[in-house]
Amino acid sequence: MNALTGLTSPARPDTSYLNLGNRQSMESKALALVHTGNLYSPHLVQAYFDRRIGHDFIFANAYNLFRIDPSQQLYYNSKLPCTVLSYSKEGGGLQTNDHLKINFFGNFNRQVGIGTSLDYVYARGEYAESSTKPLKWNSYAYYEGDQYKCYANFALSKLANQENGGIADRGYVLYPDNYADNFTDPKNMPTNLVETWNDTDQRQFHFQHSFDLGTWEERSEPGDTAVWDEFVPVATIFHNIDFEHLHHNFRMDNGADASAEGMYANNFYDSSLTHDSTSYRNFSTYAGIRLNEGFSRFSQFSLGAFIGYERQHYTMLQDTLELSYIGRNHYSNNVWAGGQLSRHLSSLFTVDATARTAISGDKVGDIDITGKVQMVIPFGTADAESGTRSDSIIIEADAALRNSRVSYLMDHYFSNHFRWSNDFDREQQVRIEGRLSYPRTRSSVRVGIEHINNFHYFGADGLPRQFDKQMDVFALEMRQGLWAGKWLQWDNAVLIQTSTDDEVLALPNVSVESDLSFHFRIARTLSVQAGVAAYYNTAYYAPNYQPATQQFCTQHSIKCGNYPLLNGYVNCNLKRIKFFLTVHNMLEDAVTNDMFIMPYYPHQSRRIEYGMILDLQN
């Protein structure tokens, strides 16, 4: 659902057992990704054109793949109540990872539906002080009448993880025989931080409703005498309310700061205890009207206009050496206006474009324009009855133009170890993407170009920076799927990307993902997929991770990458039960010991994961 205008698009639920086990791993989330090593740990997508737009609460960006977004909420329409249970377990003993998912949804009738889901992970981690314990829960309800429609969802997440700052010495992994202690157990490797935690809590409420204005018209099937009335929506009045509350807490218990003297040069309010607290509240409401597509033969597009109000509230520690820790507040009020042009009813040509600008408030002058066009070109033999062509090529184009102020927290921030006060310029982005795909051969080519002025990033010292020169980013992504009969499948993806200044934006020049699998059945009822998935990035100056601010910072001393990560798996499906077995990092010690994701964060060693999904329909 478009969180601004309420336009919905159909979504297909994921019921496939294919690649089930591999989907649990962090490396499968993007073609290029850095993270701190554990499941649901802080991460940064290094496939540049797959990055999400940064959140105004900068601490949430470390969990971009997992944070709540109303536009990604799925609403199910099911004749029968359904419960989907999923559980997976990885490792053993003090290194066990447990992952539980519960998803329930159902309908009272065709108009009213409800649902709720729970996602809980307790990943103890292979290395010391690296556990993660995220919890996500959401519930929704909707009503879809002939004229009035409303959707509501409430979600909360608690993303908690220990921070170890990476292992203290890269030699523990690169040259383990050089140490008398011979750190064969990663839990025994000393780390840069101890007794350190990050907690990021998010609460989100979204309510969207609309009322259709139109006429009732008689409908009938050709050759049938039955007649019924059908409502034809000519225009729609829509309105939404969105409330979001995020809170971040960075904690180093008594004595932990003393062991971190080498990491942090400053202690602005306490040398033995750190308890940084920052919060963000955002209330926004939008209202508008649109002329709907398809109410007559001349209405080939939907055209809408909207206006909205946004209020943001930031709270952080007071910049003072007094022990009162008085909270410092900042309020931002903005008025937005914009419009949308869309075309969704056609199967051959679709358009979706949205533009908005801040006309009042702190962000006045901000512009956000996005657009997407998809064209299907059919060819081949035409069906005698329907006239549908047997083949097609799909061409897609995406474009974006943004002129936006940085987050308030990029300009102003105070904590025990970091403080800054900036007056950054607006960042301008012009992005153009194109994709050509041929579904029959499972082939696609994607090209992206972005031009950036005033790029903002975090430098090697952990402080925000502005790159005053122009910068360009280019990416080429190619995907090809191959089948040999019905039993052998080979999927490949290659990403080539570069930026004009890799000291500011370092990206792996080549990233590869390859998945080779065999498909067969046992006793005609058990479907099996067995295979291996490989991930590879060329070596580059991967960023450092700063636990105190949860930001990824540039560094130019240690290259990471050039390590082939290989996972073997077996996925099975037996009616409504799916189960899998995965062996992660099968090539450990076979190729090289240099298996670092970031300078001091290595991959986890070889380990086994297994799990099951149960689909219950009442």
Question: Where are the language model's segments positioned?
Answer:
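Membrane-proximal, glycine/serine-rich, low-complexity loop/turn segments characteristic
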Residues: 1-203, 211-220, 228, 378-389, ...
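Structured extracytoplasmic
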Residues: 27-55, 256-270, 278-282, 286-294
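Exposed, low-structure sequence patches enriched in small/polar residues
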Residues: 80, 195, 199-255, 265-266, ...
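A generic membrane alpha-helix/interface feature
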Residues: 135, 171, 258-260, 416, ...
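Short, solvent-exposed beta-strand-terminating loops
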Residues: 157-173, 242-258, 538
